[in-house]
Amino acid sequence: MIDDNWELLNGPAAHHIEQLNSISAINVLEALVTFLIASRPAGSPYPMMPNAGGLCELHRSSTLFLLHRPGEYRDIEVNVQDLVTGEVVFQPPPCSEVPHWMEDFFNELGKLWTSGDALDVASFVLWRVNWIHPFKNGNGRTARAFAYACLCARLGVILPGRTTVIDQIMRSRPAYEAAIRAADQAAVQGQRNLAPMKQYLNGLLQIQMASI
């Protein structure tokens, strides 16, 4: 996704860097998944769970030469705006709370890693990283990459297919955003509703498998 809200530069040069960075991020993603699968804990049926270092490295590789501090959590307030109207549609937690929320995120991911299935894990990651918005910019692409890495790792394979789940998300944004809104609205009530996100991702996964 092309962005025009970078710190270091914008315009055609920034767009070209985004494209180059996307290739680097794919390599980092595949390296991360390969490492997690190969580092399966002894006696465990599950691969190693990714940590904050993996998440931050995916962000760094996606935003290098575009942000002053790629791969580092934000220290300013941000919001999510409607691309057409400019209306604020979501207010992430204050930057002072990001470390707390990220610690909570990885604790919950650790429990879900063994109690849920691969789609449960990916659904939670995709929603929660977007909800926390831990970085100044590039949160969406990092959430998608990390969720896909978790999906592949939890399944124990770098998924084949010409049309990946990540590619499809960018082509079906209304359904993607609707699933995020459903989870956001439930969170306001102190509840969890990741069923729409899981159903959405399952559909994309089936399309990817059919493209082999």
What function would you assign to each model-found segment?
Residues 1-212:
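FIC/Doc superfamily catalytic core
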